[in-house]
């Protein structure tokens, strides 16, 4: 077990732009990791914080208390925009650390949830902790003994879910586990299959809905709904179109049973008014076209649809799993450019500005108001669709346009997408630079409804790829975009979803894999690989506050309130992308295994 509590409070620096202030030791608690054994649940004999627990209802999930954070992005629409405003542009300079809790070594890509003053969080090793959200005190811990250790190679679950009096944990060994929210005892568990649960879950109308990686072959690639009370399977939607499915022809194969495309990333979103579930799907596998299509790069289409339902937005009936519509963002992917992660469900007027937006649907009336599903791809495109029917509204390369950009065109009237054929691997040993590579990934965006803006962390990364050939070993490496400014490798973008206009701020060299968070206090929070956790003005991007933590910020960022006091929580630690990101800035010497929870509040 690592030992990191000795870093001491003076190592945690706070600044309001340039004025540093160190929190006195009496204002914070540094708490050690827990020590239970796999397969056990340990509960505190006295948990006064649990006395206020109330079961979570469907109405609470639809309209959560400002005090709670009940799912990975707080609300079904993935806004990550809190109505709390005690911490605001005037008071944020006084923000201090309230408590810290160390976690054990391992992978942490998770986002805590909070209900009635209790924080539930996935800890490294595939554990679930319940803590007093005001001070980090232990309530209970569940440590899973993996039943399928062969597939539980990385405990990468992104989020827990909560409903009634149960917390739902999609464990790395392919099980969905329902835990008693008060005690941590197992209420039920159900095996999804030989797939790794990397995504997390949301609960919609009494169903626990989750995705994950694929196991072996197309039958292992699906989104599943399980009854929240019993764990009984309700439905599955297979993300590789099977024979008999209208999308099967897009594979141009008699047998695609060994092809795969998963939902490994962030969970789906839900429009309660329309009763529609939206999910993003990752790239097809194997990663390149020749490997999937018997050595023929033209074995599938150059325009959408190709290899369905890879790189798609899916609109599903949450009660049955039936497909309502799909939109394919990139056909027949050749470069592992996932279009998974959250779809932001906003309502905006259609007024894209050609200065900022490359592809605009010319048939849509200017000023018309649309309920949209917006997404930012790992491969670097912002898409805005009408979520009623999947109609294409606008899209643009992100963070910049580039000759090595993987998309060559979009038919703006139909929304049909076309990949960049010049960058497709056509012969063994081919080598290409492709843009972009993980310009964002499983760290969520945030949408500030008051100014119609999506806040997105970006990395100006491309990839140098080579496939195997005679005397040539396959390989790839991440590189800055050719011609880019090395001192502006990373940053944050404020993207207006009505106009497409962008404001870039916090430009620098430190890659970020922390979640975005906006608040009614006029703030946007974000952290990066430099150990800096910052608050900015949501309108201007001006930095208002900064804390220097013990390690790189990892996903996680949330805010909540208990007894009238607002808290901001962030986690540091190791996750899948940390070695790759750290390699880009080796001179930073970022501590990559500093797994901890940090919580801040006003004095």
Located regions from the model:
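Blade-level signature of beta-propeller repeat domains, shared across WD40, Kelch, NHL, RCC1
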Residues: 558-603
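N-terminal pre-domain segments of enzymes
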Residues: 28-83
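Short loop/turn segments that connect beta-strands within beta-propeller blades
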Residues: 132-135, 180-183, 227-230, 318-320, ...
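Short, conserved, GDST-rich strand-edge loop motifs in beta-rich repeat architectures
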Residues: 210-221, 279-307, 355-369, 459-485, ...
């Amino acid at each position: 077990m690592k030992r990191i509590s000795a870093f001491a409070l003076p190592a945690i620096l706070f600044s309001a732009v340039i004025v540093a202030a160190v929190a006195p030791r009496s204002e914070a608690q540094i708490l050690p990791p827990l020590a239970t054994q796999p397969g056990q649940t340990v509960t505190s004999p006295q948990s006064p914080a649990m006395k206020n627990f109330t079961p979570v209802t469907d109405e609470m999930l639809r309209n959560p208390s400002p005090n709670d954070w009940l799912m990975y992005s707080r609300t079904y629409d993935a806004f990550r925009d809190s109505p709390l405003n005690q911490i605001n542009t005037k008071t944020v300079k006084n923000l201090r650390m309230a408590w810290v809790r160390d976690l054990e070594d391992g992978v942490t890509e998770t986002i805590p949830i909070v209900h009635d003053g209790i924080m539930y969080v996935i800890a490294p090793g595939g554990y679930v902790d319940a803590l007093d959200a005001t001070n980090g005190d232990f309530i209970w811990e569940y440590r899973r003994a993996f039943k399928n250790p062969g597939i539980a190679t990385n405990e990468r679950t992104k989020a827990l879910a909560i409903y009634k009096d149960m917390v739902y944990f999609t464990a790395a060994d392919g099980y969905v586990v329902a835990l008693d929210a008060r005690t941590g005892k197992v209420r039920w568990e159900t095996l999804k299959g030989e797939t790794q649960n990397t995504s997390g879950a949301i609960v919609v109308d009494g169903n626990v809905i989750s995705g994950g990686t694929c196991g072996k072959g197309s039958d292992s690639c699906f989104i599943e709904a399980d009854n929240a009370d019993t764990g009984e399977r309700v439905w599955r939607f297979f993300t590789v179109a099977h024979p008999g499915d209208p999308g099967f022809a897009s594979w141009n194969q008699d047998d695609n049973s060994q092809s795969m495309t998963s939902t490994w990333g962030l969970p789906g979103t839900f429009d309660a008014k329309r009763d529609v579930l939206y999910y993003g799907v990752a790239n097809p596998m194997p990663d390149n076209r020749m490997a999937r299509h018997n050595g023929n790069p033209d074995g599938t289409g150059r325009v959408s649809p190709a290899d369905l339902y890879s790189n798609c937005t899916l609109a599903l009936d949450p009660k049955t799993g039936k497909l309502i519509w799909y939109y394919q963002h990139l056909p027949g992917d050749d470069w592992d450019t996932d279009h998974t992660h959250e779809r932001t469900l906003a309502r905006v007027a259609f007024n894209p500005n050609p200065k900022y937006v490359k592809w605009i649907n010319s048939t849509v009336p200017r000023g018309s108001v649309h309920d949209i599903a917006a997404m930012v791809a790992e491969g670097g495109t912002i898409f805005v669709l009408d979520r009623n029917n999947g109609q294409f509204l606008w899209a643009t390369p992100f963070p910049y346009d580039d000759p090595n950009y993987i998309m060559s065109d979009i038919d703006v009237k139909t929304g049909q997408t076309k990949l960049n054929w010049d960058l497709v691997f056509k012969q063994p040993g081919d080598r290409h630079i492709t843009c972009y590579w993980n310009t964002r990934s499983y760290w969520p965006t945030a949408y500030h409804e008051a100014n119609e803006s999506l806040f997105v962390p970006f990395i100006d990364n491309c990839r140098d790829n080579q496939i195997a050939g005679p005397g040539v070993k396959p390989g790839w490496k991440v590189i800055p975009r050719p011609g880019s400014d090395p001192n502006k490798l990373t940053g944050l973008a404020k993207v207006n979803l009505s106009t497409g206009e962008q404001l870039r701020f916090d430009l620098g060299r430190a890659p970020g894999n922390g979640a975005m968070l906006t608040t009614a206090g006029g703030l946007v929070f974000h952290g990066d690989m430099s150990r800096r956790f910052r608050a900015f003005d949501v309108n201007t991007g001006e930095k208002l506050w900064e804390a220097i933590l013990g390690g790189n910020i990892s996903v996680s960022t949330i805010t909540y309130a208990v007894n009238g006091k607002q808290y901001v929580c962030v986690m540091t630690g190791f996750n899948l992308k940390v070695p790759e990101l750290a390699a880009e800035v080796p001179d930073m010497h970022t501590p990559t295994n500093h797994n901890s929870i940090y919580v801040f509040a006003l004095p």
